[in-house]
Every structure is written in C-alpha cells, then in structure tokens.
C-alpha cells in the first residue's frame, strides 16, 4: 500500500506538470490535530505568484474530489526559494559545486549535521567537502537538506542588472 506522501505525489504531479511547472517537493506535516500540505513548485525561469495561485487552485480542486486527507488541512504552494530544500538524488546532483546544510537520520563519523560543498554524487551517495576533508553520505540517510544561497553573488548580479 502506498504511503500518504506517495499517494499525494501521484495526485499532484500531473496537475503541476499540466500547468508547466515541476513538483520540486511535497511535505505532509501533522502537528496535533493540524495538518499542512506544503507543495514546492519550480520552473525553468522560476515561478511567479500567479503560477503558485494557479497550481493551488487546481490542486485544491483535485484534492476536494479525491479526498486523500482526513479532516481539515492547510494547503501551501510556493517556490522552493533561494535556500531550497533538496529531496532527491537528482536535485542534489543539480547542485554539485554548491554549499548545502544537511541533517542526517543517523550519525556519520559521530555527526548528524554537516555544512559543506557537494563535490560529487556517486552510487546513491553524496560526497561532501568541509573542513579540508571529504565525507561520503548515503542519500537515504539525509533527513533534511537545504541549499545555502550565495548572497554575495546574488547581490552582485542584481547590482549589475541595475547598471544596464
């Protein structure tokens, strides 16, 4: 039997793709009696507020018909942002050479938290460089991963755009 997250993903992917976006990630969170379905979408040129609104309306309609969530819930649709969460091996591979924050489910070399540069992806593992060393972290052990934005580069690009 498929998990709640898998069932939701199966319902949501066709909707998101039909609107020209990519499902970046999905988080199904319960806290007490409150449930939140958080959906991150992306596109080749990013996504706008209008994209998020369109996707939200369409997903809401599908969820109303299919009713995969018991009780009340909050639906949130947004861009993954500059500090985007990373969920899949393909997403980690897309950011080789970039800095990430990682939290692991189990300790590796006595640590559960790492910040470093992804140097490669190989055989289901991420090679992370930090403190002049490289550690191999199996992707399935990663509980949470986020890209660390390079704000200096972003500000430099923005300033260059203002000069044009």
Swiss-Prot record:
GO cellular component, one term: cytosol
Gene: rimP
Protein name: Ribosome maturation factor RimP
Keyword Cytoplasm: yes
Keywords: Cytoplasm, Ribosome biogenesis
Localization, UniProt: Cytoplasm
Superkingdom field: Bacteria
SUPFAM superfamilies: YhbC-like, C-terminal domain (SSF74942), YhbC-like, N-terminal domain (SSF75420)
Biological classification of the source: Bacteria, Pseudomonadati, Pseudomonadota, Gammaproteobacteria, Cellvibrionales
Gene Ontology biological-process entries: ribosomal small subunit assembly; translation
InterPro entries in the record: Ribosome_maturation_RimP, RimP_C, RimP_C_sf, RimP_N, RimP_N_sf
Family: Belongs to the RimP family.
PANTHER family linked to this entry: RIBOSOME MATURATION FACTOR RIMP
Gene3D superfamilies in alphabetical order: Ribosome maturation factor RimP, C-terminal domain, RimP-like superfamily, N-terminal
Record function comment: Required for maturation of 30S ribosomal subunits.
């Amino acid at each position: 039997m498929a998990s709640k997250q898998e069932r939701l993903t199966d319902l949501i992917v066709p909707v998101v793709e039909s609107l020209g976006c990519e499902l970046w990630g999905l988080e199904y969170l319960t806290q007490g009696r409150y449930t939140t379905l958080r959906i991150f979408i992306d596109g080749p040129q990013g996504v706008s507020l209008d994209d998020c609104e369109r996707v939200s309306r369409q997903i809401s309609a599908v969820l109303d018909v299919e009713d995969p969530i018991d009780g009340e819930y909050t639906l949130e649709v947004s861009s993954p942002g500059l500090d985007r969460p990373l969920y899949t091996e393909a997403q980690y591979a897309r950011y080789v050479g970039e800095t990430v924050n990682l939290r692991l489910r189990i300790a590796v070399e006595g640590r559960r938290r790492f910040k470093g540069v992804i140097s490669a992806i190989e055989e289901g593992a991420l090679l992370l460089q930090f403190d002049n060393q490289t550690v191999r972290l199996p992707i399935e052990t990663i509980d949470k991963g986020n890209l660390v934005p390079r704000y200096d580069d972003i500000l430099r690009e923005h300033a260059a755009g203002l000069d044009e």
